[in-house]
Amino acid sequence: MKKIILMLLLFSIFFILKSESQNTLVLNALIYDNTPSRNPDFEASGSVGVQKNLVKSVLGSDGTPVYCCGNSPSATIHNQTTFQSWFHNVPGVNLPIQKDIILTQSLSNPNIYSYSNDSYFVIDGQGFDDKSVYPNERVYRDAFGNPHNFHFCLQAHTEFQYKTGDVFNFAGDDDVWVFINNILVVDLGGIHTIASASVNLDLLGLTPGQNYPFDFFYCERHTVESHIRIETSLAFKCPRYDECGVCEGDGTSCCTPNNCDNNPIYRTNCITAKCSNNVCVTSAPYCSSTEPCTVGLCTPGVGCSVVPKNCVNENHCTQDSCNSTINACQHDPIPDCINCAYIGCITTDYCNEQVCSADGRSCETRPKNCDDLNFCTVDTCSNGVCIYTRIDNCVNCTGPGIGCITTDQCNPNVCSPDGNSCIIQPKNCSDGNACNDPSCVSGGMCMLTPVNCDDGDDCTFDSCSSTVGCIHTNISNCVECQNIACITTDFCNVKICINNGTTCDTVPKTCDDGDSCTIDSCVSPSGACLYEPIANCVNCGGNQCITTDFCLPLICGPDGVTCAVEPKKCDDFNPCTFDSCISPQGDCGNAPIPGCVACNEILGCTTTDPCHPITCSAIGDQCVSTDKDCEDGNHCTINSCQNNNGTATCLNSLITHCTDCPGIGCTTTDFCFQQVCSATDGDVCTTVPLNCDDGLQCTVDSCIGPMGVCSHIAIAPKCLECALEPCITTDNCQPVICGPDGRCIQETIEDFCDDYNYCTVDTCTGVGCEHASISGCRNCTNGIGCTTPSDDACNLQVCSETGDSCLTMVLNCDDNNDCTEDKCLNTGICQNNPIDGCVTPSPVSIGGTIPPTTTGVSQVECDCCPIGQKCLLVNGHEICIKPATTGGIPELTTGCAGTTTGRATGHYTESGTGNPHLCDRYHCKRGMECHVVNGVPECLPSNYKCLDCLDLHCERQGDFTCFMVKNPNFISSKHSCYGESCCKFTPVCKPKGHSL
């Protein structure tokens, strides 16, 4: 979304300067650089527009806005914790940066000051945008692909003297809040497009001529542009103006068109410069382009030019171009392309795939493998699909690459026994039957033709044997008639010739004995008569009465001619038997009825379910049903009866997780609450909760049902078990420890991250200590550091002799030549320009002088220079100066040798020898002392005493040398170590030539 940064007064420390002629206002402020990876409020998704009431209407007690909603989210703000880093220093989350902004007086209305910048990226390359310090932070870019720092918050605080008619106008986007007299007068919160506001101070009830506080807060939280536009008539205070009318100016801002607007150095280096009220206002080097798909290019020494936008990416499988409609690069994927190291390989024939070469610089064709290892198929590829066409009449052989194809089905091609060749094997159509004549016809079909065995003799039987062929057997009882044979095979049916011997006729044999209860027949083929009695047959007047079911036998009726039925009786007069006649044999069946009890000769009681037996009543006149008793006396069983094929089986199933009590069964369904027998009443169950207490205060103990699993969850990652309560540390810079009374206390660590170097800025980030060096700073002896500005190296800030204050020492550039004009440049370089027409006077012998030093430090009295000698403090070291006995340069000598204790700071060297000056200018706080450890001065606790190689004198032990090794007992905290445990290294003697 488009960003228009709205700023008036920037950041925490805010000095606004104003001149008599009202040319400019200089705004000094503090900016807090944030990043989306550390605070999700920045680059938040969505655009919700202007959202009011995100902060309370009255400024907080610390001079910053108060978030509306505590720990609850609102639109693009997550909670109070994330909002805290907007306007407060939170190490590890944000970075503070000082910046200025200059408002210019209006030419048409001297009471109005304004500032406008449509590319206001105030901290590009700084803070989290500095890749030399934060290489892993993401780079955010504008619509043209240029990297910028889009995520920061600023605050500004000042006073103004109210006058009637005062106004304050601005336009911009994202969060802006303005407080006048601690009351909110502008409320433009949220991520939004450009929004404007105007404040008429006459409506605020202010008193003319009276001073009021003015507090301004702004956050830029989203890509992709940044603008600022300000107009105000407020009379902000300024203590001093220079001759150019610049508030707190240095007198160098006056300019002319020649050295500003038309300066070729600016133009050829892509810098826009313009004189405004004698101030040369310059921009950062920047080249723009208004044509789509082009960008501005700055060539130092030449100027701006327009070049096509480079849309080529590292993917060789995209079609890279610039879309002039949206003025943006687009990368269209190339179908069927493989991205190689230096080229893209495109496959157009899917049967011949394009792949990367081994070095990635060219493409290689890889034909698709369609071999199915079947020698009876034709393998081809079409559009990347393998096609396998079957070869008709083909047989795969076992040999390599062998397939045998048959073209004549009567003479097929088959595999040889070894499978390595094809042989012709004529088709065998014989079925092994001598009665068939085999042959093979077209298409490989077998034909079997029957053999003709007819011998033309009617009284021979012509047949064929599958093994011997045709057989001609004489036919017995054959009468040869005219062209026909009449053969008697059954003498119950004799064959004779009729019709003049042209046909045969059959004459049946008669066999009747006149008895209706016999079956008369002729026995073939012998022709003998047979008279068989009919079983169970009664001859009733020539009629047959045959009994087939002896339960229903047939007898002659009263007339002696017809048949009558006489049923068989089988009653045994027992009510518990089933009486029946068994057909057809007529046997009586009196089967006992299972489970039947005879109550009398008529009534029987039958049990069909053995679990519910049927018995006779007491007087035997009726049947009574009862239940089988399966009770086992156990309260933790389910008792039942089961009918197993007529047998009653008692089932006593145990109830799981049940305890058998005297009068009840107690069943547990949730093992977090076990059911047990009551100790006082055997008919009652008691619930006993599972004890999951692990005895630790830093865990939350619970039972997970129904399985009864104990859970012990830590209440915090860093928790200490103290006597009376758990102690939780949430901030590594403020650890919580156990107090003497067993309760939690905040551990007081004085100067936790203080490295005792007054030329560093020490902070605790929650992860570790950070020590940022202060450029141009020197440590003094008594607790201060003196910093020389980088733009004023001619005025060195040096330590006073006592080390408790800073002195300004002007760099001496006098070259003792009367014919040069001597001056010092701001960079600290002396410049000695010859004076035209000047004649150098003859040399005159004079007393010795003290040569200038690179530090410009004057002479002071030193601790141990010989009497009559002076010294210079050069980079914190004493250099003694011996006066010259004759004219010329004094002689520089070394400082004092031996040891020193410094000035009331307890400084001393390790072994009492060596260079004492390493600690002489190294200041340590109370309770700390300076020690030279391995040739480096360090502030360590007063109880520290470490040895080094000078203490051991390994050379006195013979052919030995000394090594410094890591101390295994070293304690890194300078507040917790004592004696040897404060030493990082300890010396050991080893034979020469030995290596660690």
UniProtKB/Swiss-Prot annotation:
Keywords: Glycoprotein, Secreted, Signal. Residues 1-21 form the signal peptide. The keyword GTP-binding does not apply. Glycans are attached at residues 79, 117, 323, 396, 428, 474, 500, 645, 779. GO terms for cellular component: extracellular region. It is found in: Secreted. The keyword Signal applies. Residues 105-250 form the PA14 domain. Belongs to the prespore-cell-inducing factor family. PANTHER family: PROTEIN PSIB-RELATED-RELATED, PROTEIN PSIQ-RELATED. This is Protein psiR. It comes from Dictyostelium discoideum.
